[in-house]
Amino acid sequence: MSQIAFDPPYVPRSQCDQALAVHGYAVLHADDVMGWVPASREELAQLHRAWDDLPADAYLKDGGRYRRRRHSCFVIEGAQVTQVPHRPHWQPLAYNALHGGMQRWFEPMAADMLALPVWTRLLQRLGATATALHGERPWFVEAHPFRIDTTDGIGRPTPEGAHRDGVDLVAVFMLDRHAIKGGESRVFAADGPAGQRFTLWQPWSLLLLDDARVIHETTPIQPLVPGELGWRDTLVLTCRRDGFQSA
């Protein structure tokens, strides 16, 4: 159970590409995500099991212990999905003032999870959405399974603050909220005052972002009951043209 302040501005699956093109973001209800991938609830639940085995993030510069994660990279060309040799996650300081400018080597995602057919379908759909938005080309995808918890009392999903990622498309899948309050998503136009705030709460609901046009952040989480551990599980996928970001 968790506290919800503002419901997401869901759009029908049939209007997803149009909403992305017009507004720079789109939010899909979990039922629409199942049709979008396509996938059953059981298949998506199989993917989520891997979140119970995420190592701690050793790179947090604020000294926190609240983030657990893995990281793997892929190339999508049409329907072809290829995992690339394990590589570090790197962002320039211009996009991540807190953790940019350094190579961060996270443990790779579990092989048994990546072998699930639903994982390939999910990446294929992501590539098709990026192509609808930006045109056909190879897409360089970084996958980040995250668990933010309340070990330190407060967990910060985006310790770097409101930001862009330096990619073409960002997908944030909400997998689970357990015994927390906070974790509000905020999306702002990169070139103006327009913005939205809402709380992703439904397992496997989805926020899609045209990274060039919007800035995003998620507010900190706190436990609903003091002393009781809470957490927020997400899967973040980024698509970038012309290669992975590198030093």
Predicted regions and their residues:
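Signature of the catalytic double-stranded beta-helix
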Residues: 75-142
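Short loop/turn segments at secondary-structure transitions that flank enzyme active sites
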Residues: 34, 149, 177, 215, ...
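Structured loops at beta-to-helix junctions and adjacent beta-edge loops in soluble globular domains
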Residues: 31, 76-79, 144-146, 174, ...
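Catalytic core of non-heme Fe(II) oxygenases with the double-stranded beta-helix
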Residues: 133-202
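N-terminal auxiliary "cap/dimerization" subdomain that precedes the catalytic jelly-roll/cupin core
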Residues: 1-93
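Catalytic core of Fe(II)/2-oxoglutarate
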Residues: 183-247
